[in-house]
């Protein structure tokens, strides 16, 4: 999804494929807009509404605090991407809203996570169908929610552990010491991790497949023109020096093409792709001479 594309943007020049101008350092505003919209509206608003509607009702105390912890988690992700965010004043439907500084966001996250985790009652109310931390019956596992909140505090403390002005190591140390004053309330094993069930294999079913595997292997023939490939820049930084990493990150030209069974001229050799959407073709208006090696290669060969 969008989040995976945002992550792979860090590897421009090393990784080429899918679509658009990914390998050219150009902006993809629609992807970032969608990520903001999904996180801010679709993830934060339901949690915010639970808190707003039920916070004064003691029968919903645990569920409200679970919503607060989840809200903190999503806000921490948004702050990691965009920095300043409307932490205090957002989600109320105001057209104009004040943003909080990134460093202040972290301080508020520490306080809100600690408060919510402390307020969770092991014998209190639960969600009957908890999608994140559920017990064997599917209901909220309160202990795991406590552990998640405290462990998230540790992760956020690491984010601010750099020396000033880029961090606050004194605050980070204080948070770590406070959390580890009771290590039993931190995530310590695989059993403590979240287990989400998003549906079937394909995206239309909310599948939790690996997007690269699904795109390049499961639906290879459907996506043959835009298969992900190793980038030209990375390839030609490695190839002249017989860099052993080349065989790990790249694959040679195929011995035989799946599409038509032909044997490529440069089978077994390594090349980097500079392709744009639709397979190799370069920039608009640029013609590749017949003696250029790329003129004989197709998307399968990179």
Feature locations, PLM:
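Structured, solvent-exposed acidic/aromatic patches
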Residues: 16-70, 74-302
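A short, exposed helix-loop element centered on a Lys and neighboring polar residues
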Residues: 1-13
């Amino acid at each position: 999804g969008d989040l995976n594309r945002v992550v792979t943007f860090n590897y421009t020049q090393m990784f080429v494929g899918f679509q658009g101008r990914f390998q050219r350092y150009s902006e993809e505003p629609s992807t970032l807009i969608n990520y903001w919209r999904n996180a801010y509206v679709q993830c934060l608003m339901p949690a915010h509404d639970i808190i707003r509607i039920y916070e004064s009702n003691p029968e919903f105390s645990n569920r409200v605090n679970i919503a607060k912890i989840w809200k903190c988690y999503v806000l921490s992700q948004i702050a990691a991407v965009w920095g300043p965010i409307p932490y205090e004043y957002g989600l109320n439907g105001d057209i104009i809203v004040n943003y909080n500084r990134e460093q202040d966001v972290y301080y508020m996250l520490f306080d809100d996570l600690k408060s919510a985790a402390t307020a969770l009652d092991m014998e209190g109310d639960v969600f009957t169908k908890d999608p994140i931390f559920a017990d064997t019956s599917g209901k909220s596992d309160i202990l795991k929610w406590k552990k998640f909140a405290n462990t998230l505090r540790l992760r956020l403390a690491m984010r601010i552990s750099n020396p000033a002005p880029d961090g606050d190591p004194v605050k980070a140390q204080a948070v770590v010491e406070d959390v580890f004053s009771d290590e039993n309330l931190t995530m310590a094993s695989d059993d403590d991790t979240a287990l989400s069930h998003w549906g079937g294999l394909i995206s239309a079913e909310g599948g939790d497949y690996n997007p690269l595997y699904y795109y390049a292997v499961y639906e290879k023939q459907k996506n043959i023109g835009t298969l992900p490939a190793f980038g030209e820049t990375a390839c030609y930084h490695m190839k002249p020096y017989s860099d052993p990493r080349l065989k790990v990150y790249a694959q040679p030209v195929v011995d035989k093409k799946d599409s038509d069974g032909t044997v490529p001229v440069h089978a077994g050799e390594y090349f980097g792709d500079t392709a744009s959407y639709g397979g190799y073709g370069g920039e608009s208006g640029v013609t590749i001479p017949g003696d250029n090696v790329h003129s004989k290669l197709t998307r399968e060969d990179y």
